Amino acid sequence: MTEVFTIKQCLDGEISIDETVTVRGWVKTRRDSKAGLSFISLHDGSCFSPIQIVATDQLSNYHKEVTKLTAGCSMIATGKLVASQGKGQFFEIQAESIEVVGWVENPDTYPIQAKRHTLEFLREVAHLRPRTNTISAVTRVRHSLAQAIHRFYHEQGFFWVHTPIITASDCEGAGEMFRVSTLDLLNIPKNDKGQIDFSKDFFGRETFLTVSGQLNVEAYCMAMSKVYTFGPTFRAENSNTSRHLAEFWMIEPEIAFANLEDICKLSQSMLRYLCKTVLEERADDMDFFNQFVAPGCIERMEHIADSEFEIMTYTDAVKALEASDQKFEFPVSWGLDLQSEHERYLAEVLCKKPVIVTNYPQEIKGFYMRLNDDGKTVAAMDVLAPGIGEIIGGSQREERLEILDRRMDECNLNKEHYQWYRDLRRYGTVPHAGFGLGFERLISYVTGVSNVRDVIPFPRTPGHADY
């Protein structure tokens, strides 16, 4: 039996010319010549480019099946791998047999025709959109970035911790969470005060889908020293923007005996590593994005890979923004959060490279961030990248119980819900720090695909959970 190869193996020159190979995949296009030849463009997802299958009318099923192949049909082809006579390709397969595995019913109504489709349309056929050039390229880049993240942290001595999806804690303190419940909605139990009695629920208390793995991974940081979590998180924000998803993935490292400077260095090393990796491993896909989606994205990745990031305090950033001649839509003032236009000005105009802004006012940051000695700012950091603005957010955590309790009171958080988190400060507390990187935000930045709904397989947004 002839060995089965991927199209990537065939096109990468791993196989000798004139060797008989078998490939499997889906038809992109088919064109016929008057000389009794059919040229079939076949893809299998292993690389960006399809391979051309040349079929002659000498095949036993040529007239009955081969000439009826349309976009989306699945097939298995066996034949000799030869140097291609056509332009734009180095190799093709001279078919000795073609087996049609699956036909497309009603080819005229098949959604993924051989033409360019808008990303908005493709979201309506999310189960078929991986067959397009853009989404398949995004998927391969996503894979390479995910593998690179695990490799980077493994090489740095980190342990991957699988934090829970179901939680009783709100890391962000924002309250925009998805509730998890098995209570009968038609017969909800009530307590003496007329409130929902969550003691009758599955977990015996109110529970939610996690908004972040940070609090849980901090617990393992206090025993394993260097850990990270990489998994799905959920936000019940009713936001219909190109930057928001209800379900998305986060990378969250946490380091014991560490301060703000340590995570600034780690974030820079990680981003540089990821940019280098994607340029090396996904050159064909990045060429596509650079040519058709976001011209200049390769140069942008090269720039980040080779740059030393600028570091400035929030106070200095505000002063620089106030001193600029730029007219901003949103006001700039100490104590207000930086908006995307401010972040991009700092990275693109002022510094012309990635910027790490540190030491933000405590009022605009999370309760768990370490209060600085000035009593006004916390040891927080945001990494701002040219072309997108904030891409990473992190901080040194508050390891002093009395100050953590005070911050929780100021944020009106119920300490009973965070008792285990407070225990970490009571039993062998140490300075520690970490950050979060939204995975879809990273993929969007790398590929230039501007809407995060197009860089996750099945996007979850307000009013949309169809697949």
Curated annotation (Swiss-Prot):
Gene3D superfamilies linked: Bira Bifunctional Protein, Domain 2 (3.30.930.10), Nucleic acid-binding proteins (2.40.50.140)
EC top class, as a word: ligase
Subunit structure: Homodimer.
Pfam families in the cross-refs: tRNA-synt_2, tRNA_anti-codon
Protein biosynthesis recorded as keyword: yes
GO CC annotations on file: cytoplasm
The protein's name in its UniProt record: Asparagine--tRNA ligase
Family: Belongs to the class-II aminoacyl-tRNA synthetase family.
Species for this entry: Legionella pneumophila (strain Paris)
Localisation per UniProt entry: Cytoplasm
GO biological process, alphabetically ordered: asparaginyl-tRNA aminoacylation
Keywords annotated in UniProt: Aminoacyl-tRNA synthetase, ATP-binding, Cytoplasm, Ligase, Nucleotide-binding, Protein biosynthesis
CDD domains per UniProt: AsxRS_core (cd00776), EcAsnRS_like_N (cd04318)
Catalyzed reactions per annotation: tRNA(Asn) + L-asparagine + ATP = L-asparaginyl-tRNA(Asn) + AMP + diphosphate + H(+)
GO MF annotation terms: asparagine-tRNA ligase activity; ATP binding; nucleic acid binding
Keyword Aminoacyl-tRNA synthetase: yes
EC numbers, comma separated: 6.1.1.22
